[in-house]
Amino acid sequence: MFNLNEGVLASIFTEAKHWAQMPWYAVVPAIIAICVVAYLLGSVNSAIIISKVFYGEDVRTKGSGNAGTTNMLRNYGGLAAVGTLVGDMLKTAISIAIAGVVFGFGYAGPISVSEMCYVAGLFSIIGHVFPAYYGFKGGKGVLSTATMVLILSPIVFLILIVLFIGIVWFSRYVSLGSVVAASLFPVVLHGYFAVFSVQMPGLMALSSILLAILIVWCHRSNLVRIGNRTENKLSFGKKKKPESDEE
């Protein structure tokens, strides 16, 4: 049966019967392993791979210099952008699924499945932003974060995407929409649990806060430009080359 503390994905993984109660210290190696695997998966950057393999270039030397979907679209076209989009979403989903399998089937310890799914998602996004394979220079983590929230908390995702669209529509700043949505992620997630009078698991709360801080930090230059009124605005009527990307 669905448990709010476990979430949608976790409710699928916990259908199997738990076979043991494990103390927290016995779970530490599994937690560390999942964090490392998620980080290494997140470090695989589809934009860099596609641009190098198929175009003989590093996308980070083109356009805005961001290794993300928008910059791929601008420089290499729709097919390259779709490949990047799918790759970035898959690595986040796979990281979460691994945590769900390890902590869902045959496990009944002090950490919930959803908590570990959030932790895995966090480390995958850290890998995307600071990829070990590419000199720790990656994307901004917006798409990866959106993928994680969509998988683990679809209702929270819907609320945040409405806020994002509203802010972008009225301000024309995509970066501002990303920052505000990310900043409100921990608040909306906490509110979601509060509506059902359920306490949010600690690691889930911590992961959401760290993600919000990370996304805001990644957009620090955008915020400076917004303050100086030099940040490019999104144009719905005519094509205008933006100065930065959001992936």
What are these regions (language model features)?
Residues 57-69, 133-146, 173-182:
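Short, non-helical or kinked segments that cap or interrupt transmembrane helices
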Residues 37-43, 48, 83, 125-135, ...:
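Transmembrane alpha-helix interface/packing and boundary motifs in multi-pass membrane proteins
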